From Swiss-Prot:
It comes from Rubrobacter xylanophilus (strain DSM 9941 / JCM 11954 / NBRC 16129 / PRD-1). Its EC number is 2.7.7.8. This is Polyribonucleotide nucleotidyltransferase. Its main location: cytoplasm. InterPro entries: ExoRNase_PH_dom1 (IPR001247), ExoRNase_PH_dom2 (IPR015847), ExoRNase_PH_dom2_sf (IPR036345), KH_dom (IPR004087), KH_dom_type_1 (IPR004088), KH_dom_type_1_sf (IPR036612), NA-bd_OB-fold (IPR012340), PNPase (IPR012162). One of its GO terms (biological process) is mRNA catabolic process. HAMAP family: PNPase. The gene is pnp. The keyword Transmembrane does not apply. Residues 545-604 form the KH domain.
Length: 686
């Protein structure tokens, strides 16, 4: 069975019934030649003891899909790439809110990349495929969803599902997902576009999403499985019992500027409520308390028009920004907003340390990297340390995307750049604090960024047509609210967006209002950062490596490298520098000592310079013959000093060795270069 859904001038093609027929639902989704097999399967029984939806979404990249063999000794795929993890998160986020409440069956969604055509990204294809697989399966699901990427032509027109090449030229890369009624997820990177451009893109996307969702819904009604009967559990009897006596007290307990004090108040209430209860009643009482907390929270915001920390809805928390907080590190920034604190550190290196990518995408290197760390102590807890979790990878990628548009080009700043953001305290919006801390670190390190970038997380509490939009949400507002909408940008425009919904979606009009409120908050934060450091420092840190860039003729590349790398290795050893050469003749020379770098550059210029008549060299005699001596002017380039020119005046020299021997150093002038590129020399007296 086949379904073709138009997307702009092209179409996404869905097929089912041929591959993976034992999966709960299986769809092959194709756009261009990029093809993803999406499957959705559930367990036969609910997971024992589950208190949340046990949904897992994974992306399996197969290097054969791009005609490649994996690198490394094993020559097979290993752990998921960063792109696979980010695509799994992108697929997970819009579908997770659409499962029934208290649905505890294990649900596994897998997207296997079968073809990566190097032209069309596979992430949106995976999202649409996953939606269709769930719709066809017997799994209860409040979708289907649609998904589309929107780019922008240089002339301002929008492009639906742009190619990699079109994205290179686009100032907007926004992925939007949602149901036929509303938007449920947004993920975007941009080059300082205005809020109006983003809203226009959302409106364009919403129309495409509606068409996709309706088409998949009709297709599933015709070809899908009958949905698993599932009745949501009835009302917890303890909710009504506790509401009258405790709702106001819970609401009072939520009001505090101190996260720990709020937790302690709720913990005391828990102890009081479970005291004297039977073993069977305790989990029901705790569940009732959790429900009443959410109810109290919503009453506080929608009826009392108050926040738990008593800020105005558009007010940011007390904020401080500090630059240069650590010695020797190439650049540092400490950003504190309320009970969220992030320390960002900059490391600069020569371009030999750019990240090499072995992925399904055309991009093969990454020069600017941002890594985010979230240790357990940041929330006052214990926990495991180890490889980064998906959340850390996702938050790091978002902060990286927010800053990428202002990072100077390789020609302007020939360094590999790595930022690490260490979350020291967390009570909401740590990824946006990472953006702010990273901006401080970059400017402190003398990286000539185009403009400072700040970020703020927006929230929403909504019941029917009544809603409040929140600026700079803290952890409780993220947990109990309906939206987490992160917005980063400069004074001139947006550089990154990420939105996740816990309700079934919001309109583009509401998001427009949230974007404007976010813009005002972002400008306040940028003002605070500007008071600490207004622009990048004029020089990089004394402890950072020095990099100089020179251009040599392409026909001199072999001369610089030498046989088996002999010449370039000798230069690196002699001057204590790293030298890398590009195919176009660009040479990067990096070292800790500036004088050593300059000396190495001088040597490279000398050896790769075109020899011209009249040039004077100090060279070593490399060979003597009965008619003269050969003098090395530059590595691999010799000239002949004829025996007749070994002595001053017309004095005759009978044997070359009477004047010069191999290994002697002599000062010579270039007399001429003949048509066969042979060089004639004469002695120069000191």
């Amino acid at each position: 069975m086949r379904l073709e859904i138009p997307v702009g001038e092209r179409a996404i093609v869905l097929e089912t019934g041929k591959l993976a027929r034992q999966a709960g639902g299986a769809v092959t989704a194709r756009f261009g030649d990029t093809t993803v097999l999406s499957t959705a399967t559930r367990s036969e029984e609910p997971r024992p003891g589950a208190t949340f939806l046990p949904l897992s979404v994974d992306i399996e990249e197969r290097m054969s899909s791009a005609g490649k063999i994996p690198g490394g000794f094993l020559k097979r795929e290993g752990k998921p790439s960063e792109k696979a993890i980010l695509t799994a998160r992108l697929t997970d986020r819009p579908i997770r809110p659409l499962f029934p409440k208290d649905y505890y069956y294990e649900v596994q969604v897998i997207g296997t990349v079968l073809v990566a055509d190097q032209e069309n990204p596979y992430d949106v294809v995976s999202m649409v495929g996953a939606s269709a697989a769930l719709a066809l399966s017997d799994i209860p699901f409040g979708g289907p969803i649609g998904a589309v990427r929107v780019g922008r032509h240089p002339d301002g027109g929008f492009i639906l599902n742009p190619t990699y090449q079109q994205l290179e030229e686009s100032d907007l890369d926004i992925v939007v997902a949602g149901t036929k009624e509303a938007i449920t997820m947004v993920e975007a990177g941009a080059r300082e576009v205005t809020e109006d451009v983003v809203v226009e893109a959302l409106e364009v996307a919403q129309g495409v999403i509606r068409e996709q969702a309706e088409a998949i819904e009709r297709w599933a009604a015709e070809h899908g499985e009958e949905k698993q009967p599932f009745e949501e559990p009835g009302e917890n009897p303890f909710v009504e019992e506790l509401r009258g006596a405790y709702l106001e007290r819970i609401k009072e307990g939520l009001i505090s500027t101190d996260r720990r004090a709020r937790h302690e108040a709720i913990d005391l209430l828990k102890e009081e409520l479970v005291e004297g209860r039977s073993e069977e009643e305790v989990p029901l009482v705790l569940d009732a308390l959790a429900q009443l907390q959410k109810e109290a929270f919503r009453k506080l915001y929608l009826e009392d028009r108050k926040r738990t920390d008593l800020r105005a809805f558009d007010e940011i928390r007390p904020t401080t920004a500090e630059a240069h907080v650590l010695p020797r590190v190439h650049g540092t920034g400490l950003f504190t907003r309320g009970e969220t604190q992030v320390l960002s550190s900059l490391a600069l290196a020569d371009l030999g340390l750019v990240q090499r990518l072995d992925t399904l995408e055309p991009q093969t290197t990454k020069r600017y990297m941002h890594h985010y760390y979230f240790p357990p102590y940041s929330t006052g807890e214990t926990g495991r340390l180890g490889p980064p979790r998906r959340r850390e990878i996702g938050h790091g990628a978002l902060a990286e995307r927010a800053l990428l548009p202002v990072i100077p080009s390789e020609e302007e700043f020939p360094y590999a750049i790595r930022i690490i953001s260490e979350v020291l305290e967390s009570n909401g919006s740590s990824s946006m604090a990472s953006v702010c801390g990273s901006t401080l670190a970059l400017m402190d390190g003398g990286v000539p960024i185009k403009a400072p970038v700040a970020g703020v997380a927006m929230g929403l509490v909504k019941e029917g047509d009544d809603y409040v939009i929140l600026t700079d949400i803290q952890g409780l507002e993220d947990h109990m609210g309906d939206m987490d909408f992160k917005v980063a940008g400069t004074r001139d425009g947006i550089t990154a967006l990420q939105m996740d919904m816990k309700i079934t979606g919001v309109s583009a009009e509401l998001l427009k209002e949230a974007l404007e409120q976010a813009r005002r908050g972002r400008l306040q934060i940028l003002d605070i950062m500007r008071e600490e450091i207004a622009e990048p420092r004029p020089e990089i840190s004394d402890h950072a490596p020095r990099v100089e860039v020179i251009q040599i003729p392409t026909d001199k590349i072999g001369l610089l490298i030498g046989p088996g790398g002999k010449t370039i290795n000798a230069l690196q050893d002699e001057y204590g520098v790293n030298i890398s050469v590009e195919n176009d003749g660009t040479v990067y020379v990096a070292g800790v000592e500036g004088m050593s770098v300059k000396a190495a550059v001088s040597a490279i210029k000398g050896m790769t310079k075109e020899v011209e008549a009249g040039d004077i060299y100090v060279g070593k005699v490399v060979k003597t013959t009965n008619f003269g001596a050969f003098v090395e002017l530059t590595p691999g380039r010799d000239g002949l000093l004829h025996i007749s020119r070994l002595a001053p005046g017309k004095q005759r020299v009978r044997r070359v060795e009477d004047v010069l021997n191999e290994g002697d150093v002599v000062k010579v002038r270039v007399l001429e270069i003949d048509k066969q590129n042979r060089i004639s020399l004469e002695m120069v007296e000191d």
